[in-house]
Amino acid sequence: MAFLPKFDAGGLVTCVTTDAATGDVLMVAHMNDEALRRTVATGEAWYFSRSRNALWRKGESSGQTQRVIEMRTDCDQDAVWLRVEQTGAACHTGRRSCFYRRVERTEADGGARLVFVDADRLFDPDAVYRK
Amino acid sequence: MAFLPKFDAGGLVTCVTTDAATGDVLMVAHMNDEALRRTVATGEAWYFSRSRNALWRKGESSGQTQRVIEMRTDCDQDAVWLRVEQTGAACHTGRRSCFYRRVERTEADGGARLVFVDADRLFDPDAVYRK
């Protein structure tokens, strides 16, 4: 069966990347056709940055690369799921996962606040990205 | 800390929903402000369907509801991660997860095919949705 990704108007699919060992969601990002091809071809995660409008190999600045254990696609082929071995931390803030804050209900109507969880920094982003 | 979701031009954030027991990604969908509020308020997953342009309680047609164990948001608050207890199957095709096909490399340049994995149907969609 052919892999026929269904790109959105911007030429992108959504990518969910999880830690192959724990199942934790590390990040949500986007891929264009070239990022998909390079990821499949090399076994390393490549993404497309909407803010920088550029193809991007995960870890090319930070060294925090992702080795792909498995790639899957969903029922309508507009999303992919990468199970990876993450070197260090996935988040640009230095946390293991971008999802380091829990949404907790504060009001019966659905009002909520954020609570930090698993939020230790594994690297110092100022040092790593030399900002 | 306030939860300040960063909605896209269509008023949506991306939602990744995983099985709280296994860590498997069940589905990727979208939420608008009202879907977020109802999910937080009720502890059941609500989404916004772009194709139907409608708010949607997961399982309202199929009975395959999702009880939220935890909700998190990511570093830029444009995505949420739901860990859920899934009743039956998450996918409209009757599979447990929408991600029932693996992307496998067939060519060195990144060409790929799809291989079915974990693709048993837990319900018959024709019967459940009465199409």
Curated annotation (Swiss-Prot), chains A, B:
Tagged with keyword Amino-acid biosynthesis: yes
Cofactor(s) of this protein: Mg(2+); Zn(2+)
GO biological-process terms attached to the record: L-histidine biosynthetic process
UniProt keyword annotation of Zinc present: yes
Pfam families tied to this protein: PRA-CH
Record's GO cellular component terms: cytoplasm
Catalysed reaction equations from the record: 1-(5-phospho-beta-D-ribosyl)-5'-AMP + H2O = 1-(5-phospho-beta-D-ribosyl)-5-[(5-phospho-beta-D-ribosylamino)methylideneamino]imidazole-4-carboxamide
Molecular function in Gene Ontology: magnesium ion binding; phosphoribosyl-AMP cyclohydrolase activity; zinc ion binding
Pathway note: Amino-acid biosynthesis; L-histidine biosynthesis; L-histidine from 5-phospho-alpha-D-ribose 1-diphosphate: step 3/9
Annotated compartments: Cytoplasm
E.C. number(s) listed in UniProt: 3.5.4.19
Binding site for Zn(2+): 75, 91, 98
Family matches, as InterPro entries: PRA-CH (IPR026660), PRib_AMP_CycHydrolase_dom (IPR002496), PRib_AMP_CycHydrolase_sf (IPR038019)
Known role: Catalyzes the hydrolysis of the adenine ring of phosphoribosyl-AMP.
Family: Belongs to the PRA-CH family.
Record protein name field: Phosphoribosyl-AMP cyclohydrolase
Species the sequence originates in: Bradyrhizobium sp. (strain BTAi1 / ATCC BAA-1182)
Gene: hisI
